[in-house]
């Protein structure tokens, strides 16, 4: 049986980070990857030009869709963007109790732009 991992993170339009990079890693390791997208970013190797947060209720809907259908063995958490999303993800982890969780919160892009709202830092 193929192992299943879920990435909960932002989407990087250049493919160098976020869910796109996580899926590449999962695939290279022979793991089936599922995705919950928390934010859409307009970025490239030079910088971040825009961030659109996915509404927290839609993040919750994505998480529920994955966990009610797939046997997720591991969850990797990246960009959460805001306090509402952090709360939704925390509640889902408490509800579904995945066996393995990696918390790798992305707070600042490699180009220096803030990816986590300052008022959400304490929620982590």
Residue ranges and their predicted role:
Residues 1-74:
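Small-residue (G/A/S/T)-rich helix-start motifs and N-terminal tracts that mark the onset
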Residues 74-77, 81-124:
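Conserved beta-alpha-beta core of the PfkB/ribokinase-like small-molecule kinase fold
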